């Protein structure tokens, strides 16, 4: 007989087999079911020193587990015990051989995948002990792997995704409906083990190793986390989220956890299914595990990955119907807070994009929940560094306009206004609120006049402006209080402050509209917040024409916004002081601020209209935005010619319009008393004077519907009340007596009602306010005395200029004040005085070498706009400047005859006649000759020289005074083609020239002709 050859096992297989107890001792190895410690140490030592043998060990272990898993599900307890020991061996190998984990990664994942399929014999449920050990091995693998094989090795990647899918299914398992006695603890244990496995994948390098496979992984990880999160009560969510902020541990059931570091220093957490005698996990533990896993994943994301996670959140909510608005908002807020600081802006931005993609239809839960989520994020304490405030605002405003076009009373509009208002909660740069208001003003200016929803759009956007100021003011106060810089409360009687109304005087009549003074005890200063700059008056000035809109709801909404601006944003001016020793402002001189702005087009007066109708007239349309302008377009001051044709009684000023105007004027005299007196006193005198001359109704003139007599009386009430306030605040007894006498001469009750008290707490968007009409005047004519001013203007002026307080505030003597207050006032002159014109010949920069160098550079570029720079003239094309010099047309005064109206830039006004001026009204330049200038222009044209910004005369007619020669610019963009004004040429010629160019803006600025 031959000898049987000796077949010894390979060393790695022998070391592996030695780790198992003898077959007869397997059942007694419980409940720990651990491998033999000494032999396990030999195996790990062998594998560590011979990494090349790890692949063979993995293959052998894979064969054993495949057999053990199948037998364990069939009820063989020995194989189940052997399976548990095999999984413990695998975890030990993963932990000790972490540097060479890639050598047996494929076998490792197959072992884990097979183990997750083990079921309890005859019950069919998940074997938690086996799954727990498999999850522990998987967590060890995800902890130490670099993830380079995921996405490269197709077999490994497929197995890895299958494991994630199985964990995801276990994390959402429900055992409550599977039996008569639901086992909540068993369900919670199952979910916790599965969530532990998902947490391992979420914190692993493998999830971020492949850009292509990242979306596939989060498709398997995010939904189970969200399911468990949304199943929790809102109180549990808040409590567990607060715990996350204090404790970085992934879960109370995940032990031995350490923050991610170098592979050699990492530690993989261990798991257990249940310890005898220990109370089972609660639903709060499951919620905590889900939130911590989500927190761990989000903390490591970049902007692209965060955006993809938000998309999965939206997809999850789409699947579940957006039914839990409160939880939706909470999750959105927490997700934003957990994303790295520099990427947080992606959450509100992406949610707004989702809203923009929705169809315009009746609001659905998705509309309301998504919008509430954005608002919650913007109002939360979480900072959104990098948020594109203007871009987000543009999207929200576009959505508002779309919804209004869909339905004027759309249920989504209040939420949209609140969302826009929330942009004022956090300040990310100093001029943020200025930019928001400016953008809203721009969008209002873009609304075409043909838009049927124009008035409602303007009203809603105006509510957005008010909402932004309300939210910003509240946030400022909160920030100041947290810093301990509480704003001191002003006292009613501060030394040097204006005397409170009616102090030491007879009480006002009960019918006065000043029953509840709005600005009686304002804060001594406006915002001095360290967070931001207050809204600039130059920015707010762009919105002022909304006071003249034809729709009452727009006027009333804007009036409230203007009052709010004066209360919270307007910088307080110097306070008048009766004696130099008294308190108050340190500066006694009120210097008017002349800021650069955009000019308005002025035309000749509308017949029968007066300057008083800047308050009582109705507004017209706002022109569309012109992209050729580099500066923001102003809303033009407009008035409809509604004195004979009224579509509604509120097309002219109503009693509540006068109440709003009274409040605004009262606020101005409280906030900026010196400036308000200087600009307001001439206006009050002119309004009182012109009301008697212009607002006259004669029998048969067809103006019964314009409420002429009622408006005249309301104007006189307003003027008298404002003068009385001025007298109270400046301590001028003579004016107070005169105003009270005038009020006593008017029949009671007053036509101006008390101004409605604003809602408290503030409502961001309410229904449009309903106008109230005057009571029709029964008289068909008036006596000649009513055409005179109600107040004696000479007496008023005399008392005003003799006031020592006024003289001290202006630092002017009586004669200077007389010249200041006695000037002729008009709307156009007031507008001109409120801003600097870029093209004004009197407003040129001082000589500067840098400026002259820039001048030479610009002139060398054949830029004919010499008026824009200062310096020596260079050789250039004859242009409009030379012709204007020759014509003496550089006139910067505005006609003060009558009260010219402010026309729109709209094309409907282009057909109207432009203002004409007589030959005698022009200043002729003695040093220039119009004919010579025209010859030079024609000479350039004949030579074929093209002046890009010069003027080219097409034809000149010798004609009568009624004929004119048309001119056009040589600019291809057609700058200055509209709004041309007529100048006077040489004898027998009349030339129509462009208005002066506003060269900083690259467009013409309309200069009204002087009469």
Swiss-Prot record:
Query: Which GO annotations describe the biological process of this protein?
Result: protein localization to plasma membrane
In what ranges is there compositional bias, type Pro residues? 489-501
TM region positions: none
Cleaved signal peptide residues: none
Q: Where is this region: Disordered?
A: 478-510, 571-636, 892-927, 949-1011
Q: Which SUPFAM superfamilies match?
A: ARM repeat
Q: Which domain of life is it from?
A: Eukaryota
Compositional bias (Polar residues) = 576-592, 609-625, 910-922
* Family stated for the protein in its record: Belongs to the EFR3 family.
Record-given protein name: Protein EFR3
Recorded source organism is Cryptococcus neoformans var. neoformans serotype D (strain B-3501A)
Identify the coding gene.
EFR3
